[in-house]
Amino acid sequence: MDGSAACRTLIVLAWCRVFAARRNYLRTRMISVEKIGGTSMSAFDQVLHHIMLQDKSRIYGRIYVVSAYSGVTNQLLEHKKTGEPGIYALFANGQDYMVALANLADSLKAINAGFVSLGLPLDVANAFVDQRIAEAREHLNALRHVLASGYLNRKSVLLAAREILASIGESHSAFNSVEILKAQGVRAILKDLAGFHDSKAWTIDERIHHSFKDVDIANSVIVATGYTKGTEGIMREFDRGYSEVTFSKIAVEVRPDEAVIHKEFHLSSADPNIVGLANAVIVGATNYDVADQLADVGMEAIHPKASKPMEHAGIPIRLKNTFEPEHPGTLITKDYVGESARVEIITGSEQVTLVEIHDPHMVGTVGFDLGLVGILSRHNISYILKATNANSIVHLLWDKAVTPELIAELQAKYQVVTVKPCAIVCVIGSNIAIPGVLARAAQAMAEAKVNVNCISQTLRQVNMQFLVDREDYKPAIIALNRALCLPSRAFVPLGCE
C-alpha cells in the first residue's frame, strides 16, 4: 500500500470513529417515556435487568410510568375480570373496611419481602406502606362522614374514594422501584403524582407540568406513578385505564424521542394462546390507525384517548416484550404504510352481541336509523360494527351493553328485534387494499367450516370485520392467521412447538 492509500485509509477510519462516537452520543442522549404494566412489575427482577439496567449506555434519560403490582388494584377496587369486590365496594356499601385495609398492608409488605434480594430496604419500604395506608384511612374516614351528611353528591364522593384507593398501588410500586434502583447505584427520582401530601387544586396536566418542569431528565432515571391526581378526576373517564393517560400526558409534556410500552408479550399476528407461539408473527411496524382498530375490539395496544395526543405530537410508540430485551418490538408511527401488501393482525372478541332491527317500513325511509342511534345514545352505548340492507340494521355491541332495559325499549319501537351472542374476527393491516384479500379470508373460513353471519369493511380498507358464531371464534382466528399471515412459513400444528 502506497502512502496516499494508507493516508486515505486512516482518514476513512477516523471518520468511522467520529460517526460511531456521534451515534453513541446520540444514543446516550435519547429521552424516552416508558410504561411498565402490572404483570411485568411483579417480575421486577426481569424489569430491572432486561429494561432498566440492560443497556449500560441507556440507563439515564428514561422516565418509567409504573402500574401497581399484579393483583393489587384488584384488591383495592374490584377484580378486573371477575368483578369480585375489593375495598372500594366495602366503602361504597357502607361496610367496615378497616380489616380490609390492614389485610392490604400485609399483602403489600409480602410483596416487599420478595424484593429484598434486589436491594429493597425492607424497613423503609414497610414504613412507606404503613404511612400510606394510614393516610388513606384518614381520607376515607373523612369522606365517609361527608357522605353521611348528605350535603354532597354521592357519585363525586365515591369517585374520590375510588381514586384514593387506586393511587395506593402505583405509589407503592413506584416507591419500591426507586429504592431498588438507588441500591443498584442509579440516580433515581420518584415522582409520586398521587398528591397525597399537597392540597393544590391542579388539573392533571398542571400537576404533570409542575412535576417535570425543572427535572434534568437526560441525566436521571425518573419513576412516576401511573395514577395522577387532578381536579377533573383521572378515573372519571378512564377508570382502570388511568396509567395510560398518565403515560401519554407525560410524553406530550416532555416530548421524548420515543414512548415505549413494555408488556409480557409481543404485538403479534394473532394471540399465541390460540394459534400457538410458533405461528404468531411479530408485527414489527404499524400505524396509529391500526392501533385504533385493535382498541375498537378490545385488544388495546394503547387506549385511543391516550394515544391521540401522542399521535398529534408526532411521538412514536414502541411496544416491547419485557422478557426479550434485545428484540426491537413493534413501532407505531403516524404515517407508516407497509412497503408490500400484508395482513398484520388477526384479532377479535367473543364478548359481543349482535342486535338486529328488522322493519319492512325501513326501505326508502329517510333517517330511519336516527331513532335507533338515539336509543343507543341514551343508554350510553358505542357500537363496534354497523351493517344495513333494505329492511334490517345490525349493530354489534359489547355483551355488557346489552341490558334488558335496552332490549325492552327496542322491542317497544320496532317490529322484529333479534339478539344473538356471537364473536367478531378482524383482518387488520396498514396496507391490505389489494384485490383478493377478502376472497382469501372467506375461502380460509369456508375451509375451516366457519359460517360468516355478517361482513363489514370501509373504504380505507385497514380492517375487514367478520361476525361468526361464538364456537367458531378460535377456528376462524387460526384459519385466517394461517392463510393470511403465514403464506411463506410452515404452519406448526398446535402442541408441536
Language-model segments: what does each one mean?
Residues 10-13, 26:
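Leucine-biased recognition of intrinsically disordered, low-complexity hydrophobic segments
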Residues 258-262, 317-319, 384-385:
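Short hydrophobic alpha-helical runs that function as membrane-insertion/retention elements
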Residues 25-302, 307, 467-469, 488, ...:
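Nucleotide/pyrophosphate-binding catalytic subdomain
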Residues 292-332, 346-353:
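A conserved active-site cap/scaffold subdomain adjacent to cofactor or substrate pockets
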Residues 328-497:
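A conserved regulatory-domain signal marking ACT and ACT-like small-molecule sensing domains
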